[in-house]
Amino acid sequence: MNILRRGRLGSNVKEDVMKFTTSLEFDKEIFESDILCDIAHTTMLVEQNVISEENGKKIIAELKKIAEQSMESLNLDPSLDDIHMVIESELIKELGEDVAGRMHTGRSRNDEVATDLRLSLRKKVLEIITHLIAMEKNMLRVSREHKETLTVGYTHLQQAQPVTFGHHILSHVSAIERDISRFFDTYNRINISPLGCGAMATTGFNLNRKRTQELLGFYDLIENSMDGVSSRDFVVETMANISMLGTNLSKICEELVVFSSAEFNTIEIANEYTSTSSIMPQKKNPDVAEITRAKLSTLNGELVTVLTIMKALPNTYNRDLQEISPHLWKSVYTLIDSIQMVDGMISTVKVNKERMKENAEKNYSTATELADTLVRECGIAFRMAHGIVGELVKRSIEEKVEIKEIILEVLEKNNLSLSQEKIDTALDPFENVKLRNVIGGPAPKEVERAISSFNEKISSHKEKLDEKIAEIESVKKNLLK
């Protein structure tokens, strides 16, 4: 029986109510964090002379024994509500209530669970960043391999201008970079301590909140006790980051599906990320990209669900907040799995260079550079050049002739002239690419510079990541030693 009920409520509780309200199913995500929180709190209680050193040592020793077990080995009776009471009941069973019952002095489950969530989530955020860095490294490798692989870029899914496949890959790297930065920023807001806020008004015991902050490796305190127990904005912020990253990854999945189709035929997804048809033996379907795309879509739904749960809740703690947790952890694991799938598909993709080159050489992808050449060489306004080249394209389509066959005629009609060398250069897609050597352009030299710049950022990220991982590992080591 839940020891909390014996006073005010009595032992009579319906089984279906217990099963409906328990959080034990998803409390496995905070099991270790709860023990670390208990040890830190107990250590501080001893130091502040709130409980005796003898009792504190007994409690901490038993907590360390529990930490060595799996959560499943404990008595997960739904009547205990949650992992906090499971652990406390385990302590009482081993030490007796007069000793174990002192651990919760000056603390509520409200500030306890808020602390546990932050401890567990900060670790998962670093895991996400770890996977993103690994994926970014692989994307940069592919980009370098294809910094001179000519292809065509699209707007409105219509062929637009010549680029390189390496430059195209870097467009996704650039977005992933912002995602990594967002997670690092969010980490700083996750890693602040609500422990000591109590139920919602702190406590009359002489607690040292700064000490538990230090023991648990938090960067700062949430000072206001009401905000400390009720705030879940760090969850929403993390899930918003997850949703944004999921959107970026879904774009990659979409391209893998579209560009691997027979109509595009510019890439081929590795066999291990595809399946075939039960009836059509020729099929090679991009199932992993499709399933990943679908799973990433669910992240938006999880975010909206959490926002809806939180909307208009009374200050401060409400049990509604419990229902946020399963949506958070589902989002985290869906994202991590999806990153690994996208990473694998990009790392093993086969590139059809001939098909990419063929696409870049047709459908007037060099028209912009031809207009730019008229501006540079003839001194006319760009809008005028735009109209002249537009006329060239129209006649080429209608008369079924190449632009180079009619360009001199059109230029002469407009009292303009260009050398054949300038015309050939303007209409050559790879020359187009080489000309675009400005920052962020597709020229191979600029792509190489950008790759080097991104690698420097990765090194900086890795250094920061390793530092934070070491901080967390140090907390665990010191508390469980």
Curated annotation (Swiss-Prot):
Give the EC number.
4.3.2.1
Q: Which InterPro entries match?
A: Arg_succ_lyase_C, Argininosuccinate_lyase, Fumarase/histidase_N, Fumarate_lyase_fam, Fumarate_lyase_N, L-Aspartase-like
Which pathway does it operate in?
A: Amino-acid biosynthesis; L-arginine biosynthesis; L-arginine from L-ornithine and carbamoyl phosphate: step 3/3
User: Which Pfam family, any one of them, does this sequence belong to?
Assistant: Lyase_1
Subcellular location(s): the record lists: Cytoplasm
Q: Domain of life, per the record?
A: Archaea
**Example GO biological process:** arginine biosynthetic process via ornithine
Task: Return one GO MF term.
Answer: argininosuccinate lyase activity
Q: Which reaction does it catalyse?
A: 2-(N(omega)-L-arginino)succinate = fumarate + L-arginine
Q: GO cellular component terms?
A: cytosol
EC class (word): lyase
Keywords attached to this Swiss-Prot or TrEMBL record, sorted alphabetically, are: Amino-acid biosynthesis, Arginine biosynthesis, Cytoplasm, Lyase
What is stated as this protein's family in its record?
Answer: Belongs to the lyase 1 family. Argininosuccinate lyase subfamily.
**PANTHER family attached to this UniProt entry:** ARGININOSUCCINATE LYASE (PTHR43814:SF1)
* Name of the protein in question: Argininosuccinate lyase
The species is Methanococcus maripaludis (strain C6 / ATCC BAA-1332)
* Gene name linked to the record: argH
